[in-house]
Regions:
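Structured mid-to-C-terminal alpha-helical surface segments
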Residues: 1-30, 35-45, 56, 71-252
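Glycine-rich beta-strand-to-loop/alpha-helix junction loops that act as flexible
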Residues: 48-51
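Short glycine-biased active-site loop of nucleotidyltransferases that positions the nucleotide triphosphate
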Residues: 54-63
Length: 252
C-alpha cells in the first residue's frame, strides 16, 4: 500500500530538487483531499483557489496552499474534527504527518489582509521532514452567492471533490488581483492565473466578486468601477517582479 505515494510521485517529470518538492506538495494536497472526502468534509465545504485550479483544471503551474469555503456561515465549525481522516489517509500510504495551527500574528501584511479573524489556518507536514508542509485555510464566515460542482480526482483513489465553479474561481482571483496589494505589487501567481482565465474564455461571476469585495473590503463596486481599478492595477504592475514570483512554480 505505501508504494502508492511513490507511484503518485512517479507521474511527475522530476529533474531538479524543486521539481521534486513541487510534486511532493501536490501529492500531499491530493491525499489531504482524499482524507477530507472520507471524513465527509465536502458535505459542508468547497475547494477553491489556485490549487483547485491546478488539480482540477490543469493550470500549468504548481500551487502551495489549499483554500476552502464553507457552503454557509458556521462559526462553530471545527476543522480539527477532520484531522483523524487526514492523518489516517496519509498513514494508509505509509506516511506520518503532524497538523499544527498557524499563528496569524506572524503573517505578513498581504496575508493578514486576506485572512479574517474567523479563518482558521493549519499546516500539514511530514513527521520526519517538517519543512515539507502545505497550508490549509477554511473560511467559516465566507462571502456567499457562489456555485459549486463535483469534480473527480483519481488519486490516491477515485473520489468526488466539491469545488467552486470556474466563474466563481475567476471571481476569487480577480478580487485578489485588484485588492491584494503590498507597496503596489501584484502577486505574480495572480497575474499568471488571470492570463489563464482570459485565454480559456472563462466567464466571470461578478455577483460573487461583488460579495467578496463587500465582505473583505466593505465597499460597493459596480462593473465600471471595477474595470477602472483593474486597469490601474495592471498599469502599475512590475512585470519583472511578477516573473520572479511565479518562476519557481512553472516548468518553462
Amino acid at each position: 500500500m505505501n508504494n502508492i505515494f511513490e507511484q503518485m510521485l512517479s507521474r511527475y517529470p522530476i529533474i531538479s530538487d524543486k521539481d521534486r518538492q513541487n510534486a511532493i506538495y501536490e501529492v500531499m494536497q491530493q491525499i489531504t483531499l482524499a482524507g477530507l472526502y472520507r471524513g465527509g468534509f465536502f458535505n459542508k465545504a468547497a475547494f477553491y483557489g489556485g490549487t483547485c485550479l491546478r488539480i482540477f483544471h490543469k493550470l500549468d503551474r504548481f500551487s502551495e496552499d489549499m483554500d476552502f469555503s464553507l457552503l454557509t456561515t458556521d462559526s462553530s465549525f471545527k476543522l480539527e474534527n477532520y484531522f483523524p481522516s487526514i492523518i489516517d489517509e496519509f498513514k494508509m500510504l505509509g506516511r506520518e504527518i503532524v497538523i499544527t495551527k498557524k499563528d496569524k500574528r506572524n503573517f505578513n501584511k498581504v496575508e493578514s489582509a486576506f485572512l479574517k479573524d474567523d479563518t482558521e489556518v493549519y499546516d500539514v507536514a511530514f513527521q520526519t521532514e517538517k519543512s515539507l508542509k502545505i497550508k490549509i485555510e477554511v473560511d467559516t464566515q465566507p462571502p456567499l452567492k457562489f456555485q459549486t460542482e463535483q469534480k473527480l480526482l483519481l488519486h490516491p483513489f477515485s473520489f468526488m471533490t466539491r469545488c467552486f465553479t470556474l466563474p466563481d474561481l475567476y471571481a476569487g482571483k480577480m478580487h485578489a488581483l485588484v485588492f491584494r496589494t503590498w507597496n503596489n505589487r501584484v502577486k505574480g501567481r495572480d497575474w499568471y492565473d488571470f492570463e489563464w482565465y482570459v485565454k480559456n474564455g472563462i466567464n466571470l461571476d461578478f455577483t460573487h466578486l461583488q460579495e467578496r469585495i463587500r465582505e473583505f473590503n466593505g465597499i460597493e463596486v459596480d462593473k465600471e468601477e471595477f474595470l477602472r481599478l483593474l486597469k490601474k492595477r495592471l498599469a502599475s504592475t512590475d512585470i519583472k517582479m511578477v516573473k520572479q514570483d511565479v518562476e519557481p512554480f512553472i516548468k518553462n
